[in-house]
Design a protein with these regions (language model features):
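P-loop NTPase switch/coupling surface
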Residues: 1-157, 165-174
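Switch/communication elements of ASCE P-loop NTPase nucleotide-binding domains
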Residues: 2-33, 40-47, 217-295
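Residue-level detector of functional hotspots within protein domains
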Residues: 4, 131-133, 205, 215, ...
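Short, charged low-complexity intrinsically disordered segments located at boundaries
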Residues: 72-81, 210-216, 256-267
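Glutamate identity and glutamate-enriched acidic tracts
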Residues: 77, 82, 91, 119-120, ...
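Extended helical coiled-coil dimerization/tether regions that scaffold
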Residues: 145-249
Length: 295
């Protein structure tokens, strides 16, 4: 996982270093200060582990996690839409743009790579700057779940034709964890928990409750957002508990853009406490952006 990032130049991040906690990191700042960009670069610093491994007690775990959580291990070029004309994120700077130091003592430098695909002429990728002739290096293999602002699109405003039921689901034990956490936060008992793909941009909840007037189609945006965050936490718990051996300081990363969006301040604090608990118990390193004054 990430210990610190040192920037030479990338957009507005010039000659600046960021050090991170191994558990939970809150990124705050005014609008347009590259908070979300920082999340993108963190995700870009990892690769998805192999789907099958002799270290899994359940070889289905990563497939399930990737399917029910919309964005896993995204790369910069896949989640960022740049300006209409090409904009160099590090004009006048070549080679190393920034360096990531990982908790295991390893480090990687990163460079810009312009796409050679004419259909992606305005996009660039951020790739490791591997030294020539040195020892072979590669991105650390850890699952990263990225919860962007697309998760806030209200399911109640979605046409039925845009909803597709996801056939895979977490094991019953972990579905029960989601149900219990949701009840602890909101006092709502949910059952028959599954997931829906909403278009091609969001994985939303599908469930019933003990109140006939409330189900996954009628919940508020905040209740929807809470479910998605809780599902991501439990998914990474499932991954950790699927490992036969865990020798690393951290085993996964959770990234949340605008953590406080749609959530009442009191719920933000309670959810933050639960995130800290999960980060420590299940070896998750968490990063989220916020405009909250209370967090």
């Amino acid at each position: 996982m990430i210990k610190d990032i040192s920037f030479k130049k990338f957009k507005k991040l010039i000659d600046i270093d960021f050090s991170f906690d191994k558990d939970v990191n809150i990124i705050s700042g005014t609008n347009g200060t590259c908070k979300t960009t920082l999340l993108h670069l963190i995700s870009n610093g990892f690769q998805m582990p192999k789907v099958r491994s002799p270290n899994y007690n359940n070889n289905n775990c990563l497939k399930v996690i990737k399917t029910i959580n919309r964005i896993a291990n995204p790369k910069m070029e896949a989640i960022v839409r740049e300006s209409k004309s090409y904009t160099d994120p590090a004009e006048g700077t070549k080679g190393n743009l920034f360096s990531i130091n990982y908790l295991d003592g390893s480090a990687l430098d990163f460079r810009k790579h312009n796409s050679t695909n004419p259909d992606e002429a305005q996009r660039y990728a951020i790739k490791p700057l591997y030294p020539r002739g040195g020892p072979k290096q590669s991105l650390p293999a850890k699952p990263v779940l990225y919860l962007g602002l697309s998760r806030l699109f209200p399911i109640g405003e979605t046409k039925d034709d845009d909803l597709t039921k996801i056939s895979l689901n977490l094991p019953d034990q972990y579905v029960d964890y989601i149900s219990q956490l949701y009840k602890d936060f909101l006092g709502i008992s949910i059952s028959n928990i599954e997931s829906n793909n909403i278009g091609d941009f969001k994985s939303g909840p599908l469930f019933d409750t003990d109140n006939p007037e409330i189900d996954s189609n009628t919940i508020s945006s905040g209740e929807d957002n809470l479910f998605i965050i809780v599902k991501a936490l439990v998914s990474l718990r499932y991954y950790f508990e699927s490992l036969l051996v865990s020798n690393d300081i951290k085993e996964s990363i959770l990234l949340i853009d605008e953590f406080d969006a749609t959530l009442h301040p009191s719920l933000q604090l309670r959810l933050l406490a639960k995130i800290r608990e999960y980060a420590r118990s299940y070896k998750i390193q968490v990063f989220f952006t916020t405009h909250s004054l209370s967090l």
